[in-house]
């Protein structure tokens, strides 16, 4: 069984026991989170349920396995011939989740 969930403004396709990295979610390691914004749910051999915009009664349960930071990206702005340069870096904080269960009532 698989589902498409919305987390942190992005969409993720998840299976049971899959591991995903999403934008930071506050919580301690080992705590469980439920996603009720399920956009689609289905099985590979049967037709899927597509939400309008979400599937009612569908819940995805996940466990926080790690809190980490992504690789650093460099943002560099420049205007030619004007001696204008700006350099900034950014490291996005991420949460690693293990999908435990996908249910639809």
Swiss-Prot record:
It comes from the Bacteria. InterPro entries: bL21-like, bL21-like_sf, Ribosomal_bL21, Ribosomal_bL21_CS. Coiled coil: none annotated. One of its GO terms (biological process) is translation. Keywords: Ribonucleoprotein, Ribosomal protein, RNA-binding, rRNA-binding. GO terms for cellular component: cytoplasm; ribonucleoprotein complex; ribosome. One of its GO terms (molecular function) is rRNA binding. This protein binds to 23S rRNA in the presence of protein L20. Belongs to the bacterial ribosomal protein bL21 family. PANTHER family: 50S RIBOSOMAL PROTEIN L21, LARGE RIBOSOMAL SUBUNIT PROTEIN BL21M. Part of the 50S ribosomal subunit. Contacts protein L20. This is Large ribosomal subunit protein bL21.
